[in-house]
Amino acid sequence: MDMQESMMGRGRDAIEMIVDAGSFAEGVVGAKSFDDPDFGPGAVVGTATLQGTVCTIIASDGGAMNEKFPVVYAGIIGLEEGYKMAEAVYASILEDAEKPLAEKRPLVLIVDTPGNGPGKVEEIFGMNKSTAAYQLALAEARLKGHPIIAMVIGRAISGAFLCHGLQADAILSLDAQFGTMIHVMPLTSVSRIIRKDLETLEVLSKQSAVFAAGPRFFHSLGGVEALVETLDGMRPAIVARIAEVRAAKLEGRQDDLGPWGRGKLGEARGGRIERPRVIEMMTRDFAAVADRYAPSR
């Protein structure tokens, strides 16, 4: 496998590669203007067209640093960044509230983030509330009919990927030759938490998709719908996926999209073989006690 030029830290470049030339208007989504350059500088939000279709763009800026929060740099999604991204999603929902399902604008997420910014101040104020707000916003947009496509161009790691990517209808990723990484946490952190030596985990990472960091392993789990082989391939892949997602929503096939759809895809690819059994067991066990939790009438 020949290594290609990395896109890590190049979220802004990726935007220009994907959208119609010169169409990206940063800081404006619908009627919402993001006028404060010091609020969430690591989050890039705006409006562009993609083959003439208006879409919302949300990305992390690998070259920005939030001076109010020292741990927020190099694409990390911090407290302010999470809220800023959520605001962009809600502005999109509001702008298209009266439009039919076929005209809801797509949301394109450019993913390159090494994680969240869990500094002391962020934890005190509620970093989890910020990332949860962004996740909820994307889930609401998805269920209201907006096609949401995540394009992994570099790092998709930990809780930052949980909020900036995993709520999408479909996830695409540049293939492994671009150095893309998708995983929960570095093996060094896993080693400390589960008390296994690093050497053992490195062996496991070559055998198990759960421990591995590359996009191909995540693809086998169904977490990535498709791998993109070239930089020029990002734009047509996103355009095609938007059309597929929109068609599925118009046909009422929501369960084929988003987290639930990726679960089924992983099962079909043989990467999540225990999933059906666990779901069946949980459904059976809950049915046995469901009456206790039924709402009072």
For each predicted feature, which ranges?
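Amphipathic alpha-helical segments at domain termini/boundaries
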Residues: 1-35, 190, 195-297
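Conserved catalytic cores of soluble enzyme domains
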Residues: 115-240, 244-248
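A structural preference for short, pocket-lining loop segments at secondary-structure junctions
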Residues: 53-61, 65-72, 80-118
